[in-house]
Amino acid sequence: MNRLILLFMSLFLILTSCANREDIPDSIFWINGTHAVLTKVNNADINRFGTMAPSNTNRTRVLNTLDNSWDITTREDLDYMIDTLVVGRHNPFFLEQAIAYGITSMTRSEFELEIRAVQERELVMFFRNMFEAYEAFGERAILGWDLSRATQLCAFGYIAEFYTYDEAVDKALAIGKVIQSQFNSWDDFYSSYFYGYAYWSEDDLENPRSEYSRRVSIFNNLKADSKSPLNLNWNLELIR
């Protein structure tokens, strides 16, 4: 029995072993930073492109995730989803709603006056998140949420074997340059990301035990970690 346990533990360590930071260049480590919060949520490896080692087991795991969470079953599906995220998948719907609710034309004082009439706590959080996202970023309101998932899908595409390593890295670096052009810093980018996550998840933003609060805590821990990609220069040249 003890031998079986040791064998299982050895196999587990092989499948889940973490890469060393030195194994990847700064540019790819920077890309890992763009989806680092979700990588940590998934208990995956922030030091490895793909967030896990290539293996049959991990390929099956990622294929199931892509199918169940994204309805992606082919390379063509993946290409389409990434392209859609890069130009904005949830962001356009967010803007449509913000316009419909009159959010985009309100000053802060006007918003604060209007929100007093809203009784439901969940709606107050929803509208406040929407107003603050638009006030901070305008038409890029939650684009960070879309772009973060685009780079992650590039990494998953590699593990799923829809892309070669070179194809996935080239796609991710191209998206990284878009991210740099749209946002000014890691804080800037992740502010948009969290506005988007709040919009998509409809989570309780005031509950310290909510998934939203957990992700914010992960982000703050990453910023405090000197070995985190979030401490790389935001304007790092993204080349191979």
Where is each model-derived feature located?
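C-terminal motif of bacterial Sec signal peptides marking the signal peptidase cleavage site
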Residues: 15-17
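Polar/charged low-complexity regulatory segments
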Residues: 19-165, 169-240
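Sec-dependent signal peptide recognition
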Residues: 2-9
